[in-house]
């Protein structure tokens, strides 16, 4: 049963004298929705064919390469778990809610960009939007910031699975990005919020809903968006989004920055996704352009160089050579593959990276030992091929397991 304060607030704010749509909203907000997936560029045809053979029905959506997933009548979910298919395990698609895919689609204008941008994803876990950014901006470098250490493992797992050598992970409080004054060409701020739009997942986000809590969350969001706008270059663009539906966390935040900065910024687009209208989770997003410089009232601080152990690595790999656009770095005994490294190189001394590019193996006794995913960043000559029998063996291998197999 929905919280009465929640119901009263939304009826008064959005559905006054509109009982019919209010009831539709209440009847829809908790209903489960069909899954959607985002297929990696260049993999669309083969992934669709394999999933359709497995009994899935893929219905296109308004976002390129995003499909709504339904099942044939003879479908057996115990035999065909979407998350255990080969294409999911190797990162050919990502399971992502449709509304949650819209912010990156908005930031990229729905197309793949070939410009070289430095991009900040301010609150990136679990990684759906970060991996989407890596696909839409393949020639850019993305800083995936996650302020909560507990959420880093899930982010790291998804970044590794989806292959993102043009991404680094940082662990800064969102407000700290104001110290990186006008550094980023694009910023995505998917802000922490009340989560009112996630009830379709079975969450209890509105169980203890109270306007006082909403105001507290909105105060944090104001600090985060000020930090983001300070870090954004003049002429740069950012998208602000939440999975909340109340006006304090959405339209109220836009009103706050419009009053604070006036003509220095411009909100060029905003949209709220209502479950009973858009058949998605509840969501809000807005696109903002920075027109003039913003000087924050808090002076920049000098941040310590935490990356002294990250160095370029130039030793030969024997039968291995780098794919185009990849630069090797070493961190202790680990070997890293970094795409578009020249974009982020000037900032290696300015911010601490928990992860830089992809780890592709380690160096020991003057020899390189690749890991299970190194093939994505290396050209490999004269190697033996091993046949895996099923998805379980593939999953075990990709997690670092050792398999005993006959060579082809």
Feature roles, as predicted:
Residues 114-115, 176-190:
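A short acidic, Gly/Pro-enriched loop at the edge of an enzyme's catalytic core
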Residues 232-234:
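Helix-to-beta-strand junctions that scaffold the AdoMet/dcAdoMet cofactor pocket
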């Amino acid at each position: 049963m929905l919280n009465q304060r929640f119901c009263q607030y939304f009826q008064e704010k959005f559905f006054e004298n509109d009982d019919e749509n209010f009831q539709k909203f209440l009847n829809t907000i908790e209903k489960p929705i069909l899954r959607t997936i985002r297929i990696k560029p260049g993999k669309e045809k083969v992934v669709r064919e394999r999933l359709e053979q497995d009994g899935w029905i893929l219905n296109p959506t308004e976002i390129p390469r995003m499909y709504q997933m339904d099942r044939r009548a003879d479908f057996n979910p115990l035999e065909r778990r979407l998350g255990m298919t080969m294409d999911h395990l190797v990162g050919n698609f990502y399971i992502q809610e449709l509304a949650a895919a819209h912010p990156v689609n908005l930031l990229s204008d729905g197309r793949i960009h070939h410009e070289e941008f430095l991009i900040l994803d301010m609150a990136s876990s679990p990684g759906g939007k970060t991996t989407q950014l890596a696909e839409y901006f393949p020639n850019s470098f993305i800083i995936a910031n996650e302020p909560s250490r507990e959420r880093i493992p899930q982010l790291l797992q998804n970044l590794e699975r989806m292959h993102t050598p043009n991404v680094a992970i940082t662990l800064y409080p969102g407000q700290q990005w104001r110290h990186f004054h006008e550094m980023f060409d694009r910023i995505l701020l998917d802000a922490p919020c009340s989560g009112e739009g996630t009830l379709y997942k079975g969450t209890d986000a509105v169980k203890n809903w109270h306007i006082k809590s909403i105001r507290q969350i909105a105060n944090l969001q104001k600090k985060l968006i000020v930090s983001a706008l300070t870090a954004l270059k003049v002429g740069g663009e950012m998208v602000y989004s939440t999975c909340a539906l109340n006006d304090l966390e959405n339209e109220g935040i836009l009103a706050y920055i419009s009053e604070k900065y006036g003509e220095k910024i411009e909100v060029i687009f905003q949209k709220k996704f209502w479950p009973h209208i858009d058949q998605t989770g509840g969501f809000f997003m807005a696109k903002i352009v920075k027109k003039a410089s913003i000087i924050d009232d808090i002076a920049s601080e000098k941040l310590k160089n935490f990356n002294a152990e990250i160095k370029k690595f130039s030793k030969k790999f024997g039968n291995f050579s780098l794919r185009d656009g990849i630069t090797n770095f070493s961190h202790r005994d680990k070997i890293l593959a970094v795409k578009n490294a020249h974009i982020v190189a000037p900032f290696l001394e300015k911010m601490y990276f928990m992860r830089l590019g992809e780890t592709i193996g380690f160096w020991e006794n003057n020899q390189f030992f690749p890991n299970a995913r190194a093939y994505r960043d290396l050209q490999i000559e004269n190697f033996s091929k091993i046949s895996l029998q099923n998805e379980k063996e593939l999953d075990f291998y990709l997690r670092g397991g050792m398999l005993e197999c006959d060579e082809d």
